[in-house]
Design a protein with these regions (language model features):
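Short, low-complexity disordered leader/linker segments with a strong preference
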Residues: 1-29, 85-86, 107-112, 332-337
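Hydrophobic alpha-helical segments within soluble ligand-binding/sensing domains
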Residues: 77, 136, 147-178, 226-227, ...
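Hinge/cleft segment of the Venus flytrap/periplasmic-binding protein
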Residues: 26-28, 37, 128, 133, ...
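Flexible loop/hinge segments that line or gate small-molecule binding clefts
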Residues: 105-155, 278-286, 291
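Extracytoplasmic "Venus flytrap"
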Residues: 29-57, 66-80, 87-89, 95-100, ...
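Short beta-strand elements in bilobed, periplasmic/extracellular small-molecule ligand-binding domains
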Residues: 56-70, 205-223
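Short, solvent-exposed amphipathic alpha-helices that sit
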Residues: 41-56, 156-163, 191-210, 225, ...
């Protein structure tokens, strides 16, 4: 009897070992195209994507990430999407170069039955006459394996305006009854840039303020360009400039250099606001060198994007849109970080 039990136990152990040995590790291939690596915010975003995917790996499931820099070139990004198809990606995460042409990229994924998660730059839709509609590209809404993860840029613009309204003189530094500002915009085709430009000023007019736009220029999210545009505006308009609105913190940091070079003092004779809450911007707010910024939550957004990508890999149902809220960052908030 003891001998029989011993044989049975040995068989169980052998079978168990065979089962363990035969268990295969499933590796999913994830293609990730970022519109431009030099963008400060998207650098934080893509690094967090990589880090978060790593935390989700198990003994049975691994993720092979293939990152690609589109270099702000639509043709380059289209090639990357086609390469992802050739490489047999199981899911694609896409940060589109041109939101107005995202349908081309969406169609590549859909026609090849590859799940697609668009991030950060919301695709646009147009009517038959080419007029922009206030909704995203219908290819997202009409496909169960395509979604967008981002934040409502109208909220970020509104928060910028509210940061100005929260100052002691509500933005009217010289007391002439109007708020005179310059606007440094990101990519004019980007819906986030459009909404931040519109709603930052709308927050002021909705509060009953009279505004005057002294200058509005395109900085394409670039810090050096932001410095150049702000310097030019300060040279032309001098102390008439009371507020500098920047569509992102990269350009705001450039504007800060121009402001300091011109001998102006943020909080005394000029205000400066951005968006993203980059570490250097938050530090500038702590020091009083920036009026405020708006937290564009790269951690929340990147985690949401990865989570929905994993859901798609599992064949689970998803929503077409996932929104992550912005947060106002003033001196008190910055000091608490």
């Amino acid at each position: 009897m003891k001998k029989t039990l011993a044989i049975l136990m040995a068989l169980v152990m052998v079978l168990g070992a065979c089962t363990f040995a035969s268990a295969e590790v499933k590796t999913y291939k994830v293609g990730i195209s970022i519109y431009q690596y030099t963008d400060n915010f998207m650098t934080l975003y893509r690094n967090e994507i990589a880090a978060y995917f790593k935390t989700l790996e198990t003994d049975e499931v691994k993720y092979e990430l293939v990152f690609a820099d589109a270099k702000n070139d639509m043709a380059e990004q289209t090639n990357q999407m086609n390469n992802f198809v050739t490489q047999g990606m199981d899911v694609i995460i896409l940060n589109p170069v041109q939101t107005s042409s995202a349908d081309v990229l969406i169609d590549i994924a859909v026609s090849n039955e590859i799940p697609l998660v668009l991030i950060n730059r919301e695709p646009l839709a147009y009517d038959a006459d080419g007029n922009t509609l206030d909704e995203a590209y219908e290819g997202i809404l009409n496909n169960p394996k395509v979604c967008y993860v981002g934040a409502d840029a109208r909220q970020s613009g509104t928060y910028q305006g509210e940061l100005i309204l929260a100052t002691a003189n509500q933005g009217d530094i010289n007391g002439d009854g109007k708020i005179s500002y310059i606007m440094i915009q990101g990519d004019p085709e980007n819906i986030d840039a459009q909404y931040r430009t519109e709603f930052s000023v709308k927050a002021l007019t909705d509060a009953g303020k009279t505004v005057e736009c002294l200058d509005s220029q395109v900085g394409n999210w670039d810090q050096t360009k932001g410095q150049e545009l702000c310097a030019n505006a300060l040279t032309v308009h001098g102390y008439d400039v009371e507020v500098v609105f920047c569509n992102n913190d990269g350009m705001a940091m450039g504007a800060l250099t121009a402001i300091q070079t011109a001998g102006r003092i943020v909080g005394e004779d000029i205000y400066l606001v951005g968006v993203d809450a980059l570490p250097e911007a938050v530090e500038a707010i702590k020091l009083g060198d920036m009026t405020g910024t708006v937290l564009n939550d790269h951690i929340g957004q990147s985690h949401a994007a990865v989570d929905v990508a994993v859901q798609l890999l599992k064949g689970e149902e998803i929503q077409n849109y996932y929104w992550v809220n912005y947060v106002k960052v003033d001196k008190a908030y910055a000091a608490a970080q």
